[in-house]
Design a protein with these regions (language model features):
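Bacterial N-terminal signal peptides that target proteins for export
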Residues: 2-15
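C-terminal motif of bacterial Sec signal peptides marking the signal peptidase cleavage site
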Residues: 22-25
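Bacterial signal peptide processing site
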Residues: 27-30
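Gly/Pro-rich cap/lid or specificity-loop segments adjacent to the active site
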Residues: 40-323, 381-508
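Flexible "cap/lid" loop of the alpha/beta hydrolase fold
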Residues: 252-270, 343-344, 353-368
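Structural motif
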Residues: 310-326, 332-337, 369-377
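Short helix-capping/linker segments at secondary-structure and domain boundaries
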Residues: 332-351, 389-394
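Long, low-complexity segments enriched in small/aliphatic residues
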Residues: 354-387, 391-394
Length: 508
């Protein structure tokens, strides 16, 4: 059974830093009369019955010719199926040992906003051979994302929105963030306003049930990472009788407010950054050693970037303080990236911001040709729809000191959440996640996860009727694949339904 560097399933449900147009505190705003009213899909009112899949060879599956592709039409609104339809893009990776096949396992990589269909192509990397022997892997692009249509489409040039200097330390910088947030929202409404009321987590959870029905299975297994934990827990709460087994890795607290989860994330990233800098100060081989004073050097560098951003290219955003914070956030998802961050910070001290810009680009999934997918746009649209939060600029500003109190270095970057405060679509009605009637659900947390801190993962396990918590001691986001201990516990549960002992800890 293999282990590997885990998948970095970003974005998490709340924003990582303010350069994301500060998505912490997403929710409904003072909404215009034309904004849509959203309700959670009901499981009894909708007469919608999905068609079966017509699987065909894929034209984009790089890893194996066995992967098949299909589509599934689902309604915008399950309570009003005539309102319009999404066409979900779905991939099937058949079990590699048909004689051992148990059934289908749906998988989601996180987000929200990430298309997940590629997990079928890369199943051999993400999952053990025991799992791929026993399960058909079903991976899909949730409504509004990836190759599912229509997809959220807001802007083409991220730099003009996310490269701004942040946190703001002048009225002019603050107004620039507000203006950029409003402009981004306006573009989203202009290009995708028709679908924005219909891409909530609850709607995607209902799509999962439609996919199950289209597969012809009474019960189904599920493996979700990061935000995929919230999606899976929502599905298990709405359709408990259809759950065979479910694993939620890098789990969020599903019933927290966006402010509470934002505070937890700010504290988590602050803690990981402190761990990184302390380790660097103790290790002369660290490229950002600075005579054992990495912490002071980091603070000084960020002040320098605030005063004088580094220009890497005339065609790109300068490396502002906000860009640097994004780069740091990217590296905090796993200590695998820490050596890259060491060099990037050291280079920036010498006036070269290319390394920080590369990490920034990696965070935003910038492609080699300079284009972007729609991940961040869909992330914003889904997050703002899902989470009631600050509904005015003043409310956002008033919350910032609380973020700074729990995270002195990074807190302000989490606190400024203008985009969702200005979002033009009313928030969806949330359901309380309980998993009641779904049976045992395995929840995985790591001790050094900044994006979904262990404290939040514990809350997920506690709020589920039968949540089983597994802990991995590691500095990374998500735990499956880290070592044989966690793989064995998870695989035995999914394959044999052997429920592990809660609070089991796996050490790297």
């Amino acid at each position: 059974m293999k282990s590997h560097t885990p998948v970095l399933h970003k974005f998490t449900r709340v924003a990582v830093i303010t350069a994301l147009l500060v998505l912490v505190g997403c929710g409904s705003s003072g909404t215009p009369d034309s904004a849509s009213e959203n309700s959670a899909p009901t499981t009894s009112a909708a007469p919608f019955v999905p068609a079966s899949f017509d699987w065909k060879a894929c034209d984009d599956s790089a890893s194996t010719t066995s992967v098949q592709c299909g589509t599934l039409e689902v309604p915008y609104d399950y309570n009003n199926p005539s309102a319009g339809t999404f066409t979900l893009y779905v991939k099937l990776r058949p079990a590699t040992n048909p004689s051992l096949r148990i059934g289908s396992m749906m998988v989601n990589p996180g987000g929200p906003g990430f298309g997940g269909s590629s997990l079928a192509d890369d199943a051999d990397y993400y999952f053990s051979s025991d799992l791929t022997d026993h399960f058909d892997i079903i991976a899909w692009d949730p409504r509004g994302t990836g190759k599912s249509t229509p997809a959220v489409d807001c802007v083409d040039n991220y730099d003009q929105y996310f490269g701004l200097d942040s946190p703001p330390d002048s009225p002019e910088e603050k107004q620039a963030l507000v203006d950029a947030s409003q402009a981004f929202n306006d573009e989203c409404m202009a290009n995708s306003g028709e679908i924005l009321p219909y891409i909530s987590t609850q709607a995607s959870a209902t799509d999962m049930n439609s996919i199950r029905q289209a597969l012809g299975e009474d019960k189904i297994s599920y493996f979700g990472f990061s935000y995929g934990s919230e999606l899976g827990a929502t599905w298990a709460t709405m359709f408990p009788q259809t759950v065979r087994a479910a694993v939620l890795d890098g789990a969020v607290d599903p019933n927290s407010t966006s402010a509470e989860e934002g505070m937890a994330q700010a504290k988590g990233f602050e803690g990981q950054l402190a761990t990184f800098l302390a380790a660097c100060s103790k290790n002369k081989a660290c490229e950002f050693y600075n005579g054992g004073k990495s912490e002071a050097a980091f603070d000084a560098l960020l002040l320098d970037l605030d005063a004088k951003p580094l220009v890497v290219s005339a065609e790109r955003t300068p490396v502002t303080q906000g860009v640097a914070f994004t780069a740091v956030a990217q590296a905090m998802y796993s200590d695998y990236y820490w050596s890259q961050l060491e060099k990037a910070l050291a280079d920036a001290q010498q006036g070269d911001g290319a390394g920080l810009l590369k990490l920034y680009d990696d965070y935003y999934q910038r492609k080699d040709d300079g284009s972007y997918g729609n991940e961040l746009e869909a992330f914003l649209a889904i997050s703002c729809l899902d989470d009631p939060g600050a509904t005015s600029i003043k409310a956002v500003d008033d919350a910032v000191p609380s973020f700074v109190a729990v995270a002195p270095r990074l807190g302000a970057n989490f606190g400024y959440g203008y985009s969702c405060a200005l979002w033009p679509v009313k928030a969806a009605v949330k359901i309380e996640v309980t998993g009641k009637g779904a049976g045992p659900i395995v929840v995985i947390g790591t001790t050094g996860d900044p994006a979904t801190p262990l404290a939040s993962t514990r809350k997920m396990a506690a709020e589920l009727e039968q949540g089983i918590l597994l802990i991995v001691e590691a500095n990374q986001h998500t735990g499956y694949g880290a070592n044989e201990c966690i793989n064995t516990a998870v695989d035995s549960y999914l394959i044999d339904l052997t429920v592990p002992v809660s609070e089991t800890t796996c050490k790297i």
